[in-house]
């Protein structure tokens, strides 16, 4: 899913009077960090819901998890769920290939989200490299954590 889930929550929150930036959403997520629920980001219910926020809450409800109430809780559920998805995917790749990987390269728009990159590092136990790619330009940054 990538940042699809986060982008949809941001779109829902934005009104004529207020447009939330990603740093503002990250701040909300940080305030709610520690909220325990995790969703399967690849579940079909997140492909094109009328409300991503409601889809996250309903998934938590139907799987017997704590239901996020605040937008910060919804955001941290998504961040933790994306990081869990990275962890699961890396484990699957390691099992299929018979290799152990020591690092993950995050490319595209998501690499700019250091909160997500920190979550990926925490969940996977791997080094995370954030790489911005535009045409032939590649900038690699190892997280200073």
Question: Can you say where each PLM-predicted feature lies in the sequence?
Answer:
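Active-site core segments that coordinate phosphate-bearing ligands/cofactors
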Residues: 1-104, 112-145
